[in-house]
A protein has these predicted regions:
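Cytoplasmic juxtamembrane regions at transmembrane-helix boundaries
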Residues: 69-94, 163, 167-177
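Hydrophobic alpha-helical transmembrane segments
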Residues: 56-74, 149-161
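Membrane-embedded catalytic cores of phosphoryl/pyrophosphoryl-handling enzymes
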Residues: 2-8, 129-226
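Aromatic-anchored segments of alpha-helical transmembrane domains
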Residues: 13-17, 98-103, 179-190
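Alpha-helical membrane-inserting segments
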Residues: 14, 18, 25, 68-72, ...
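N-terminal transmembrane-helix/juxtamembrane module of multi-pass inner/ER membrane proteins
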Residues: 1-68, 108-111, 116, 126
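Membrane-interface loops
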Residues: 27, 84-166
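Alpha-helical transmembrane spans of integral membrane proteins, capturing the lipid-embedded, hydrophobic core
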Residues: 8-12, 62-63, 93, 97-101, ...
Length: 226
């Protein structure tokens, strides 16, 4: 558990540095942008636009609602034979299905960052504004960070909790798989020009923080003392 907190602190510092002092986001977006046509080629691609942004999003929303329904039913009428770890896992997963997308959405509302496809650099009309940088006079906030679409998949990180605390390796494998899945969803959005790399990475950071906090909240008392 302490290792997670150290990883969160270190990764937050690295992300803040990358946002403020590096051109990582621009370098990745430049690579994805076709300067000859002046477009992000994947913006209208079926896989990126129709499947990833619409179909997959709907599937994940249905899965989230189903998870909430099962958790609510078990809370109202606890299923006999369910272990404490399974019940904790279900409650963490259901809570994450709500909190991860909600927190990311609320942070987007106060974000100044614009999406790549809105920037002058990529054929749009807005200037590039770094994290914590003041928005130039006359320029509206972009509300594009963190990555909202990725957060719709990143709540599945909570699946790792079903193997805790007795099978940490399986928990780590499940968590890693879901992080890769969430990152892939975010990466495809980046190919469309909808987000920068750090937008997706901040969503991952937030998801890890929320899932860790939920597990500590729902877990048995001995775990909370770690």
């Amino acid at each position: 558990v302490r290792g997670v907190h150290v990883a969160l602190a270190v990764s937050a510092s690295l992300l803040l540095w990358a946002d403020r002092y590096s051109d990582l986001d621009l370098l990745v977006a430049d690579w994805m942008f076709d300067h000859a046509s002046g477009t992000f080629p994947w913006r209208g691609a079926w896989l990126a636009d129709r499947f990833n942004h619409a179909i997959l999003k709907s599937w994940l929303q249905v899965l989230g609602v189903a998870t909430l329904a099962v958790a609510a039913w078990d809370w109202w009428r606890p299923r006999p034979g369910w272990t404490a770890s399974r019940r904790i896992g279900l409650r963490v997963l259901a809570s994450a299905a709500v909190l991860v997308p909600t927190v990311v959405s609320l942070l987007k509302r106060v974000s100044a960052s614009h999406c790549p496809w809105d920037l002058q650099r990529y054929g749009g009309s807005e200037p590039y504004v770094r994290l914590l940088e003041a928005v130039p006079a006359g320029v509206s906030s972009g509300h594009c960070m963190p990555a909202g679409h990725a957060s719709g998949a990143l709540w599945l990180l909570a699946l790792a909790v079903f193997w805790l605390p007795h099978q940490p390796r399986k928990a780590a494998a499940a968590g890693a798989a879901m992080l890769v899945f969430g990152f892939t969803v975010g990466w495809i959005q980046q190919l469309r020009g909808a987000h920068f790399l750090t937008h997706t990475l901040w969503s991952i950071w937030i998801a890890v923080l929320i899932v860790d906090s939920l597990y500590r909240y729902f877990a048995p008392v001995p775990l909370k003392k770690l």
